[in-house]
């Protein structure tokens, strides 16, 4: 047996696995083999939710055809005591999103589990120099320190994220939790992928007013990031940039400080 091998984890992604894990890929274990726990929610010693990278068992592969194709994948498990939405709804909304914005499809679900493709990348929030900075006005100084190449790259990623969110909404689906950690930046191929559709809602299930509000809320994290990045780059063109400046008074306190920083950066750049 080879020491290492590329194993597909989605229609366009693969990861290099060592022999230790290839054994379970080639010979399905009796139970899902947990490679790593990447997220968990608990109260004291009581586990409520666990998000794990797993190698699918024989039964899992029989139950879900995509688990046979992508045995290494992400499994979210809910335990008694954890309130959660219907996993079938999450599966259906994820599948709908995959057709609207070309993301890897979901793998499967049971009443207490949800499975999706492993995405080899990092959350956008970990790439942003502005994430977690408080107060928000401190991001003006962070923006001034940001190299042009970094600011330009982050801007292009955010434009891509904005385009995908808008396409999703125009297709009748609102994400419901479009925080920056739910945008995964994958390097090979370089792309940004939206994850976690547990809180997604369809337009037909909302009143017109509720739908409008939900869509606006989904855009807020990206629009704030757009303001911060324009403090580094100066005023940009296009719907994304314009909407961020238009809604700035609703997004940030002391919007005049950000306006001034953007104008000054533009004059320096020019």
Regions from the PLM with identified roles:
Residues 164-168:
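Conserved hydrophobic alpha-helix
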Residues 170-180, 185:
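Catalytic-loop of the protein kinase fold
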Residues 186, 191-270:
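C-lobe/activation-segment region of protein kinase-like
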Residues 102-157:
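Conserved structural core of kinase catalytic domains
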Residues 1-40, 45-48, 249-270:
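Regulatory N- and C-terminal appendages and interdomain linkers associated
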Residues 92-102:
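Structural motif at the C-terminus of the N-lobe alphaC helix and the adjacent alphaC-beta4 loop
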Residues 23, 31-92:
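ATP-binding glycine-rich loop module of kinase domains
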């Amino acid at each position: 047996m080879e020491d290492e091998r590329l194993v597909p984890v989605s229609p366009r992604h693969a990861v290099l696995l060592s022999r230790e894990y290839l054994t379970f890929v080639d010979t399905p274990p009796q139970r899902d083999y947990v490679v790593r726990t990447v997220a968990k929610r608990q109260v004291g010693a009581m586990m409520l939710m666990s998000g794990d990278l797993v190698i699918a068992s024989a039964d899992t592969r029989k139950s879900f055809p995509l688990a046979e194709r992508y045995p290494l994948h992400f499994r979210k498990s809910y335990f008694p005591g954890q309130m959660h939405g219907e996993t079938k709804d999450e599966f259906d909304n994820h599948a709908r999103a995959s057709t609207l914005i070309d993301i890897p499809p979901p793998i499967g679900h049971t009443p207490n589990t949800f499975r999706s493709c492993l995405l080899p990348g990092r959350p956008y929030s970990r790439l942003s120099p502005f994430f977690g900075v408080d107060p928000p006005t401190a991001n003006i100084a962070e923006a001034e320190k940001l190299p042009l190449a970094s600011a330009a790259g982050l801007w292009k990623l955010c434009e891509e994220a904005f385009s995908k969110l808008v396409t999703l909404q125009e297709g009748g689906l609102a994400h419901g939790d479009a925080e920056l950690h739910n945008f995964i930046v994958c390097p090979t191929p370089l792309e940004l992928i939206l994850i976690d559709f547990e809180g997604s809602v369809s337009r037909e299930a909302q009143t017109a007013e509720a739908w409008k509000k939900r869509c606006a809320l989904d855009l807020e994290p990206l629009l704030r990031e757009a303001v911060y990045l324009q403090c580094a780059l100066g005023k940009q063109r296009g719907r994304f940039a314009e909407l961020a400046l238009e809604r700035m008074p609703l997004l940030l306190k002391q919007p005049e400080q950000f306006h001034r920083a953007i104008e000054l950066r533009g004059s320096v750049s020019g």
